[in-house]
Amino acid sequence: INGDAVYMTSAGVDHVPTGLDPKKAMIERSVPKKVFKDAMLAWEMNGVPLPNAHGGPLRMVTPGYFGINNVKHLGKVAFTKEQSSVKYMKKSYRISPIGKKGSQYPSCWEMPVKSWITRPTDETGTVKAGKVQIVGVAMGGTKKVRSVKVSVDGGGSWKKAKFIGPNLGKYAWRQFVLETTLSAGTYN
């Protein structure tokens, strides 16, 4: 890797239709070069060649980063000083306030911490009174999930949940559970 490189830039070999500017149509993404140590090249899925629909024959996988950085139909990887100048890098896939140009904001790279509560609720969203297990999953983007806290009073107080199941590494979802007593009703 070039010592002064700042980015790992991956380019897909998608066919650009005649008449379109390749800089506006091709998929090429630059991510910080630190991604390289955990990035993977995928050419198989479940023991068979990676299908075209999933980016085959070769796909870049950047764990902990938004999916747009997992370039499909990979044709080139380069280590560069500058980010790619194609449209999908310079202007697209950015989180910006409504009415603001995306190009003024950083590209979507690292995923934020994410979590979901998966139970206890029925189809109506109502919880029955009594002892319950609040179960969910959490993922830390590019960081290891070290703990999960759950609030049952809209953020007024927090209780530490326990991890259940195996720890499959910092990029994997972690399942958690909190045993508590609740009144009947709906909770956010």
Which residues are covered by each model-predicted region?
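Extended, aromatic/histidine-rich regions of cofactor-dependent oxidoreductases associated
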Residues: 2-188
